[in-house]
Amino acid sequence: MVFQQGALFEWMSVRENVGFGPSMKSMPKNDKKEIVDHLLDVVGLQEFKEKAVYELSGGMQQRVALARCLANDPDVILMDEPLGALDALTREKMQSLVLKLWKETGKTIILITHSVEEALLLGERLIVMAPRPGRIHKEYRLPFAELGVNADLREVKKHPEFGPRREEILNMIWDMEEEIMGTKEDAA
C-alpha cells in the first residue's frame, strides 16, 4: 500500500526502507540487495540509497514508498492519494513512473484519487463514487493509461476524447455535490 504521506521509517535509510519487507520475510541478503538495488534504479534513487528519508523531497519519499511496496512483490497495489501532496511537475513525473511500473510488472493497481485528470490518465477503469451512502455511481473504460505508457502525458491530455470525458465526469460530480448540499436548481 502506498499512502498520501509516505509512511516511511524516518530513522532508516532509503535502502533500509525499501529492504524492510524482504528482511521481514527472512530473504537471503544477496537476494534482498538485488531487489533493493533494482527498485532503486527503477525509481531513480540509487544515488540516495544511504540518505535518511527525512532528507528527501516529498516526491523522492513517494518514490521510496513505491519501491518499498514493490519490494514485497504484491499481486495488488493499493495507492491511496499517493500523489496529492506533490507539486505539479513532480506529480506528472510520478504519474509516468506509475504507468511505466504498471506496464512492466503487470500488477493490478487500485488508485484512489480526487483528481479527475489523474484518474483519467492512470486508469483503465474509472469508478465514480457517490456519497451517502458510498456506492458506485458510474464506471468508465478508458484508453488513456495505455496511451500514456508510450507517450508524454501532456500529449495524452490532447487526445480528442480526454477533454470531453473530463468535463462529463466533473459535471457529474458537481451535480452530485449540489444534490447533497441542497443547492441544485430544478430545471423548469
Language model segments and positions:
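Catalytic "switch" loops of ABC-type ATPases
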Residues: 4-9, 115
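Catalytic Walker B motif of ABC-type/P-loop ATPase nucleotide-binding domains
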Residues: 77-80
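Conserved H-loop
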Residues: 106-112
